[in-house]
């Protein structure tokens, strides 16, 4: 089979309807648009969501929440993910290179989730109280 010989199946494509070509075609005179009204006119259509002057749904519903502009710059790292890093001294750059935080991250925070199995030294990274206790119990330190 060649790409230039591929054709749609029989009956899969319908011929385009020619409108306004006489009463016998079934689509003459008004061309399937009915009589009068906004939808019968040329260029006469309303915007998406328009409800005929009634207050539209997106304006009837209350506003809710917001999108934080700082969320994309702050990342969390699990305690167990620190075991994946080959280095013992961990800073933001090391986390970025390992792919544990986003490239545009400016702040990282270590949270208590899992266990740290070796002594690690954190530099310039904030930690939760539980994570701090776990790191220091494993012989690590936080600067």
Swiss-Prot record:
One term under GO cellular component: cytosolic large ribosomal subunit
Comp. bias intervals (Gly residues): 21-31
The keyword RNA-binding is assigned to this record: yes
UniProt-listed Gene3D superfamilies: 3.100.10.10
SUPFAM superfamilies, alphabetized: Ribosomal proteins L15p and L18e
Keywords: Ribonucleoprotein, Ribosomal protein, RNA-binding, rRNA-binding
GO biological process: translation
Protein role: Binds to the 23S rRNA.
Record protein name field: Large ribosomal subunit protein uL15
Gene: rplO
């Amino acid at each position: 089979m060649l790409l230039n010989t591929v054709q749609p199946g029989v009956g899969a494509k319908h011929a385009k309807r020619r409108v306004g070509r006489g009463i016998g075609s079934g689509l003459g005179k008004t061309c399937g648009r009915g009589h009068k009204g906004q939808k019968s006119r040329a260029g006469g259509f309303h915007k998406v969501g328009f409800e005929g002057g009634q207050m539209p749904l997106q304006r009837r519903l209350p506003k809710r929440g917001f999108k934080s502009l700082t969320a994309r710059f702050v990342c969390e790292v699990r305690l167990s993910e620190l075991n994946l890093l080959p280095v013992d001294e961990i800073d933001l750059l090391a986390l970025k290179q390992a792919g544990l935080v986003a490239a545009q991250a400016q702040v990282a925070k270590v949270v208590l989730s899992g266990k740290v199995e070796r002594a690690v030294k954190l530099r310039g990274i904030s930690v939760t109280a539980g994570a701090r206790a776990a790191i220091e119990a494993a012989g690590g330190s936080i600067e």
